[in-house]
Amino acid sequence: MSGTLVLVRHGQSDWNLKNLFTGWKDPDLTALGIEEANAGGKALAEYGIKFDIAYTSVLVRAQHTLKLILDKVGQPDLPTIRDQALNERDYGDLSGLNKDDARAKWGEEQVHIWRRSYDVPPPGGESLRDTGARVWPYYLTEILPRVLRGEKVLVAAHGNSLRSLVMVLDKLTKEGVLALNLATGVPMVYKLKADSTVASKEVLGDMSGAH
């Protein structure tokens, strides 16, 4: 019997609040981000799931989110694997810049293309396609085999690394994934079939606040 895959985007970070491109930079959660992570953990506790293993990125905002969730579900010592394959999209030269300042420097249209096109990367950075090119193989080799063995796996990561996974799981087109926004701290619970396709998906919270 196939297992369960739960995906959670980290809570709001300091740089989300300051409207900065974050990428592989490493700010922590805001007070609101901590609340969001705790709410996600509470939702999972009420759902009644117990995990076998967790995965997260090497960035503190995702790791902090995971810790708060695991505390809420009563599994603070759950085995956890941290890998940069699950890191946020690398924004390259945009990293650390205020989004309005970036628009002033490169023009609103160009920055919009970098942010919202599927395959055009910012200078020195990754496109969404590039992000998926490292996330998806990691999922196939490290995470999916555990789910197919019947394990319950939690992944706490980032907006774009998770969008790369959801694109394939939900069979979204390029246009569909570009329109997809994942709310911070809201768990998505996937039950997978033996052939690795999705049997069911349940969202434990409100995705309308996604950004």
Swiss-Prot record:
Binding residue positions for substrate: 9-16, 22-23, 61, 88-91, 99, 115-116, 159-160
InterPro entries per UniProt: His_Pase_superF_clade-1, His_PPase_superfam, PG/BPGM_mutase_AS, Phosphogly_mut1
Keywords assigned: Gluconeogenesis, Glycolysis, Isomerase
Enzyme Commission code(s) on record: 5.4.2.11
Pathway info: Carbohydrate degradation; glycolysis; pyruvate from D-glyceraldehyde 3-phosphate: step 3/5
Keyword Mitochondrion: no
GO molecular function, one term: phosphoglycerate mutase activity
The protein's enzyme class: isomerase
One of the GO biological process terms: gluconeogenesis
Family according to the record: Belongs to the phosphoglycerate mutase family. BPG-dependent PGAM subfamily.
Oligomer status and interactors: Homodimer.
Protein name: 2,3-bisphosphoglycerate-dependent phosphoglycerate mutase
Organism, as annotated: Rhizobium leguminosarum bv. trifolii (strain WSM2304)
Higher taxonomy: Bacteria, Pseudomonadati, Pseudomonadota, Alphaproteobacteria, Hyphomicrobiales
